[in-house]
Amino acid sequence: MMTEDQKFKYLTKIEELEAGCFSDWTKEDITGDLKYLKKGIIEESIELIRAVNGLTYSEELHDFTQEIIEELDISPL
């Protein structure tokens, strides 16, 4: 499903989000969302990626998960 390059790219972006590099990090606590997204990427779990996409309150995290879904050509929930 995912190449090692894709995993590296996604996990790097998650690290940036965890470091608070994105604007809505200060508005919302997305720690749990990031934890589950990271797990979904490591385990290549489409279900976890879709769940984070559908349930997060963070617009930037939603956009990021949407990008993953589109890049992997999987259907959203």
From Swiss-Prot:
GO biological process: defense response to bacterium; regulation of cell cycle
Reported effect, residue 63 to N: Weakens interaction with B.subtilis hupA. Reduces host cell filamentation, nucleoid deformation and inhibition of cell growth. No impact on B.subtilis growth rate and morphology
Keywords: Antibiotic, Antimicrobial, Cell cycle, Growth arrest, Host-virus interaction
Main function: Acts as a host growth inhibitor by inhibiting DNA-binding of microbial histone-like protein HU, thereby preventing chromosome segregation and causing filamentous cell morphology and growth defects in the host.
UniProt subunit comment: Interacts with host homodimeric histone-like protein (HU) hupA; thereby replacing dsDNA from the HU-DNA complex.
Name listed for the protein in its UniProt record: Inhibitor of histone-like protein HU
Organism of derivation: Bacillus phage SP01 (Bacteriophage SP01)
